Amino acid sequence: MFHGEQNVQDVTYLNSEQLGDRVDARRAIFDVYFENDKGEKFIVEMQNVYQDFYKDRSIYYSTFPIAEQAQRGNWNYELHDVYTIGILNFTFPEDKHSDSSIFREVKLMDTDSHEIFYDKLTYIYVEPVSK
């Protein structure tokens, strides 16, 4: 899944319930949330049924492990990698005519050069074969 870039040998499970920064803020509950020995964060979501705006939801979820890396005082803003992994039991509408399972890895890209702009934020979606 990580093209040899990750070799997760030790995992520390983190609190899967993320509360907003205000009393009335929306919370998020991840299916699995863990950190590897390098401090990189992994969110794993298993979604059984199609949900409108699932991509938006996964982007929203990724903001929690980013924000929790902030440190008070003198901080240089260096972030650890964040991976949001969606194991889906549905196919995104744009993939509905595919006859094979779809593995999609998404990173921030410069639209002019088509080069990866930022490699520490990764979204991985695994979709089943269309029925």
Predicted regions and their residues:
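Elongated, amphipathic alpha-helical interaction scaffolds
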Residues: 1-131
